[in-house]
C-alpha cells in the first residue's frame, strides 16, 4: 500500500496532513440578492499566501516612516511608488502560461491565475496609497487640481492608475464572465496602455522594473509560438489519416450531441498528453482569432484528441451551430464540410496533476461536463489494471513506474439529464467490462471499481444547507429502454426488471407542475442522498429519458457473470444528488494507504467536496497515531 513506513516519512506525512487541513479549509458560500447569486470563497491556503504578500508589501512601504508626520507624506509617496513598481514582474510571471513558478511549484497556469488577479489587486492598493499620499501632501496647499492639469508626470501617473483600476474592475468574475472573448481582447489592450503609461511615469533609473515584465511576456509568447509551430506544422509530423492539410497537422470533425454539446475529434494529433490535461483550441474558419481552453476527454492510446464542449455563448455556441448545421443526422443537405473536417490549431497541453496510480484509493467526483476531466483519469488507471491482469506489464525495474498501486476507484458523476449519459456511455461500459474480465480471469482479483451516476434536475447542482432524507431512484445499466430498479438493503441486492414502455402503475411519470414525486412535495432529483445503501425507491422522470443506443448495450449475462455483483458490472444510476462526505468516508475506511480525492464541477460541488475532505481528515486524525492514511485533494475548477 501507498503509505509511509519510516520515522522520517511518518513525520513528513503528519506535517503534510496538518498543512492540507489548514490550506483546504473554507467557509460556506454566501447567498445574496434573494438567493439569485452565490459568492464562493477560496480555501484558506491561497488566502494565507495572498495575505502574507500583502503584509510584506505594506511593511516595506511604511518601514521607518511616520504616517502622522506631514513632512513624511512625500517620502511615503515615493516609497509606495517604488514598491508598487517592483510588483510588476511578479504579476506578469503569474500571468504567463510558460513560467518558472508553475514549473517549480508543480502548478498549472490556471491555478496561478487566481494569484495573478490578487497580486494585481495588491498592486492597485499600493498604487492607490502612493497616489493618495501625494494628493494628501498637495491638498495642504490646494494644489491637486493644478498638478493634474499642468504636471506631465502627474498626468501620466494618474492615467496609469485609471487604466489599472479599469483592469482590476473588469477582472472581477461577474464582469469578466459576461463575455470571454471581449474580456481577453480588452485585457490585452489595456495592459499595453498601462505599461506605456507606467514607463512614461517612472524615472529612467528604475525603468528596468518595466522592462523585466516586458521580457517575461516576450519569453512567454516566443515559447508558446515556437511550440505551437512545431505542434501544428505538418512538416514535423506525419498525418497517418491522410485527411489533413499539407501545411497544417490537425483537422477536426464536429458532431452535435445531446444537451447542446459539441464533440470535437482530431485524429492522429501531433502532441503527447496525459489524462486530465487540456489544450487551447483554435478554429479560424468557425471562430476566427479566438482560442479557447478545453479538457482532453481521450487518452493517448486512443490516438485522437476528443473534446466535449457545451454551447454557452460566443465561440462555443458557434461551434455547436456549425456542428448541427453540417451533421448528416440532422438532415443537412450538404454535409461535405463536416465529413471533410476543418483545420484547427492546438496549443498545449497544459495542466498538472499527481499521477493517481501512486494512491491506494481514488475518489473521482464530477458534475456535468466535469466528467471530461475525471473520465480519462478513470480510464488511465483501469487500462493499467487490464494490462497487469493480462501480463502485458512486467515487474522489472524499467516497468515498475507503469504499475498502479491503486486498489479501488470510486467514480461519481452528477448530471442534469439522462441524455448526457451518451457522452461517456461507451467509455463507461468499456471500463466496467474490462474490470469484469479481470475478475473472471482472476477470481480473487483485489481491485475494486464502483460507479454511480446521479441524475438531478437542479440547475446549479449545489448541495442544500442541510441533508434531506435519503430517497432516490436507482437503475442499473446505461440504457433507459430497459431499466433495472434496485432496492439495496445492507448487503442484499434485489433486482427488478422494468420495461421503459410498461404501463405498470410503478412506471415513472413526469411530476405535475408545482408538485413533486415526494410525499411532502418537491422532487427527488434535488434530494441529497446521504447513503446509497439505504434508498427508498420513488418515480421521477423530470430529467427526461435517455436515448438508447443498441450498439453499446451491455452484453448478455452468462453463467460466469452471475458471480459478479451487479454493482461492479454496471453503473448505479440514481435520481438525486450525492452526499460526498459519506461517499469519501466509505472509501477511506477501506484504504490501506494514501487516498486521492479529485473533483471537477460547479463551485457548489467543489466546495462541498473540499469541506468533506477537511472534515474527514480531522475526524479520522490522519497521520496522528490512529492509523488513518493521508488524503490528497485536487479541485479542478470550471471557468476562467
Predicted regions and their residues:
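Acidic, Ser/Thr-rich intrinsically disordered and amphipathic helical segments
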Residues: 75, 84, 88, 99, ...
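Classical protein tyrosine phosphatase
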Residues: 81-82, 110-131, 211, 216, ...
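Reductase modules of NAD(P)H-dependent flavoproteins
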Residues: 111, 307, 312-316, 321-323, ...
Amino acid at each position: 500500500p501507498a503509505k509511509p513506513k519510516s520515522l522520517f516519512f511518518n513525520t513528513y506525512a503528519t506535517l503534510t496532513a496538518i498543512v492540507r487541513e489548514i490550506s483546504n479549509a473554507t467557509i460556506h458560500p454566501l447567498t445574496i440578492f434573494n438567493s439569485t447569486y452565490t459568492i464562493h470563497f477560496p480555501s484558506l491556503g491561497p488566502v494565507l499566501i495572498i495575505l502574507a504578500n500583502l503584509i510584506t508589501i505594506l511593511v516595506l512601504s511604511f518601514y521607518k516612516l511616520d504616517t502622522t508626520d506631514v513632512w513624511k507624506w512625500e517620502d511615503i509617496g515615493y516609497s509606495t511608488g517604488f514598491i508598487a513598481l517592483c510588483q510588476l514582474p511578479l504579476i506578469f510571471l503569474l500571468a504567463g502560461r510558460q513560467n518558472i513558478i508553475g514549473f517549480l511549484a508543480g502548478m498549472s497556469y490556471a491555478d496561478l491565475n487566481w494569484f495573478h488577479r490578487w497580486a494585481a489587486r495588491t498592486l492597485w492598493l499600493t498604487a492607490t496609497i502612493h497616489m493618495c499620499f501625494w494628493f494628501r501632501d498637495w491638498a495642504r496647499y490646494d494644489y491637486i487640481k493644478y498638478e493634474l492639469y499642468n504636471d506631465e508626470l502627474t498626468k501620466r501617473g494618474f492615467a496609469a492608475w485609471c487604466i489599472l483600476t479599469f483592469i482590476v474592475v473588469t477582472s472581477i468574475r461577474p464582469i469578466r464572465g459576461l463575455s470571454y472573448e471581449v474580456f481577453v481582447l480588452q485585457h490585452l489592450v489595456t495592459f499595453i496602455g498601462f505599461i506605456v503609461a507606467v514607463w512614461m511615469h517612472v524615472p529612467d533609473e528604475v525603468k528596468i522594473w518595466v522592462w523585466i515584465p516586458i521580457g517575461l511576456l516576450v519569453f512567454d509568447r516566443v515559447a508558446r509560438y515556437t511550440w505551437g509551430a512545431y505542434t501544428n506544422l505538418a512538416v514535423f509530423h506525419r498525418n497517418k489519416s491522410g485527411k489533413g492539410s499539407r501545411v497544417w497537422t490537425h483537422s477536426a470533425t464536429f458532431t452535435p450531441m445531446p444537451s447542446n454539446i459539441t464533440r470535437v475529434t482530431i485524429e492522429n494529433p501531433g502532441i503527447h498528453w496525459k489524462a486530465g490535461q487540456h489544450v487551447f483550441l483554435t478554429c479560424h474558419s468557425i471562430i476566427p482569432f479566438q482560442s479557447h481552453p478545453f479538457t482532453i476527454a481521450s487518452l493517448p492510446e486512443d490516438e485522437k484528441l476528443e473534446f466535449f464542449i457545451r454551447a454557452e455563448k460566443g465561440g462555443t455556441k458557434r461551434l455547436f451551430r456549425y456542428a448541427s448545421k453540417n451533421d448528416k443526422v440532422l438532415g443537412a443537405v450538404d454535409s461535405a464540410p463536416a465529413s471533410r473536417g476543418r483545420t484547427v490549431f492546438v496549443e498545449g497541453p497544459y495542466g498538472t496533476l499527481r499521477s493517481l496510480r501512486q494512491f491506494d484509493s481514488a475518489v473521482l467526483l464530477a458534475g456535468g461536463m466535469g466528467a471530461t476531466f475525471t473520465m480519462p483519469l478513470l480510464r488511465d488507471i483501469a487500462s493499467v489494471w487490464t494490462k497487469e491482469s493480462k501480463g502485458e506489464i512486467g515487474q522489472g525495474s524499467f516497468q515498475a513506474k507503469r504499475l498502479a498501486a491503486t486498489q479501488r476507484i470510486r467514480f461519481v458523476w452528477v448530471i442534469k439529464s439522462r441524455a448526457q449519459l451518451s457522452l461517456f456511455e461507451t467509455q463507461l461500459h468499456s471500463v466496467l467490462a474490462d474490470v469484469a474480465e479481470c475478475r473472471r480471469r482472476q477470481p480473487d482479483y483485489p481491485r475494486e471499481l464502483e460507479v454511480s451516476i446521479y441524475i438531478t434536475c437542479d440547475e446549479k447542482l449545489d448541495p442544500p444547507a442541510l441533508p434531506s432524507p435519503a430517497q432516490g431512484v436507482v437503475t442499473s445499466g446505461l440504457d433507459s429502454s430497459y431499466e433495472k430498479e434496485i432496492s439495496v438493503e445492507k448487503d442484499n441486492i434485489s433486482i427488478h426488471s422494468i420495461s421503459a414502455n410498461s404501463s405498470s402503475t410503478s412506471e415513472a411519470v413526469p411530476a405535475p407542475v408545482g408538485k413533486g414525486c415526494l410525499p411532502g412535495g418537491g422532487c427527488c432529483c434535488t434530494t441529497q442522498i446521504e447513503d446509497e445503501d439505504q434508498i427508498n425507491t420513488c418515480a421521477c422522470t423530470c430529467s427526461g429519458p435517455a436515448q438508447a443506443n443498441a450498439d453499446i448495450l451491455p452484453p448478455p449475462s452468462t453463467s460466469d457473470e452471475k458471480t459478479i455483483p451487479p454493482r461492479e458490472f454496471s453503473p448505479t444510476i440514481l435520481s438525486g444528488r450525492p452526499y460526498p462526505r459519506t461517499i469519501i468516508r466509505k472509501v477511506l475506511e477501506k484504504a490501506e494507504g494514501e487516498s486521492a480525492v479529485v473533483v471537477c464541477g460547479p463551485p457548489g460541488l467543489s466546495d462541498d467536496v473540499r469541506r468533506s475532505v477537511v472534515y474527514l481528515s480531522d475526524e479520522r486524525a490522519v497521520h496522528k497515531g490512529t492509523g488513518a492514511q493521508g488524503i490528497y485533494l485536487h479541485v479542478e475548477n470550471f471557468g476562467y
